[in-house]
Amino acid sequence: MYRAVTRQIEVTVEPNFVPEQSSADRSRYFWSYTIVITNSGEETVQLKTRHWIITDASGRQQEVKGEGVVGEQPILGPGERFEYTSGVPLSTASGFMTGRYQMVTESGERFEIDVPAFSLDSPDSKRVLN
């Protein structure tokens, strides 16, 4: 599990390779990832936008920006959490993702929180030590 905390908001990510939606012969690899956002602060916040950078094993990057996550802009009161699962395809057997969410407080203050960089590894990927 991958974890980042910004302004008392914790984001955890758990990626999972999905073999039944992947085909090495067609250079298609698919992962699901489950994200849990927990508000440990004292203010109610709302997730407004997402910004992802997805990088495959060849170094190709894809940038994804949009409103909310999975069609929602969740509101998190103090102590509340929001969990969702989404997915990502790549044409290589491994890669990684990183990102940010834009949040807004009840008073209208906007700020960004980090989504931890997380690895997308399939059984076909070769381990590389940097």
Task: Place the predicted regions along the sequence by residue.
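Low-complexity, acidic Ser/Thr/Pro/Gly-rich terminal tails and inter-domain linkers that flank the onset
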Residues: M1-S27
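Intrinsically disordered, low-complexity Pro/Gly/Ser/Thr-rich segments with frequent PxxP/GP/PP motifs
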Residues: Q62-S94
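Short glycine/serine/proline-enriched coil/turn segments at secondary-structure junctions
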Residues: S23, T44, S91-G95
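Asparagine-centered strand-capping/turn motif at beta-strand->loop junctions
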Residues: I37-G41
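Short beta-strand segments
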Residues: I9, V45, Q62, E109-I113
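Terminal connector regions
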Residues: P89-N130
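Short acidic, flexible loop segments centered on an aromatic residue
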Residues: E43-Q62, M103
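Short, solvent-exposed loop/turn segments enriched in Ser/Thr/Gly
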Residues: R28-T34, M97-T98
